[in-house]
């Protein structure tokens, strides 16, 4: 039995690269989709916010000298490409997914309309939110917090490269320990970078817990959803 009825899964664009330097790694996206399918079969309603960093990052080197808002819009379009790839892979795996974009691209994806998104979730479809919040200067982490609050998700699952929040960078400090759980205030006081400040504040204000876990660890998503000790829970 899932511990959560409805979740918001935040996937970074980089997670889709696998071991590649750029783009979408086919084996990686298939494995991720199979993990999502596993939790939908348990009765969990799943919405996804996808990043675009595997294709373009508004804050990265390729955007140097570019107007920040323009670069951010390009990043949003990258998330639409990722969302389409994710939805197509889900279809091939026998799932039904709907892509909803915060920026209107009607010929390609439907616009984000909250009641429609809620209807899809209740029907057991996976909803993939693309184009971030639709506004420059906001990260896809903030989009995850916003959409999570809007759809009434019980938790935001932040899928990353590391299996939780650590007391220090585990790559640099062998003595770093993983927190099983930590409060929002404690994470702020210890300056732990769970999400960017805007996303973090939104989750805290809405009393929306965050679970940070590794998407590269097989079965981790299932263990998180069934309430096992996996990753780090950030709570009020």
From Swiss-Prot:
A single GO BP annotation from the record?
UDP biosynthetic process
Localization of this protein: Cytoplasm
Chief localisation class: cytoplasm
- Activity modulation notes: Inhibited by UTP.
Q: Where does this protein hold UMP?
A: 52, 72, 133-140
Q: Supply one GO CC term from the record.
A: cytosol
Task: Please name the pathway.
Answer: Pyrimidine metabolism; CTP biosynthesis via de novo pathway; UDP from UMP (UMPK route): step 1/1
Give its E.C. classification number: 2.7.4.22
What GO MF annotations does this protein's record show? ATP binding; UMP kinase activity
Tell me which family the UniProt entry assigns to this protein.
Belongs to the UMP kinase family.
* UniProt-listed HAMAP family: PyrH_B (MF_01220_B)
Return the protein name. Uridylate kinase
Q: What is the lineage of its organism?
A: Bacteria, Pseudomonadati, Pseudomonadota, Betaproteobacteria, Burkholderiales
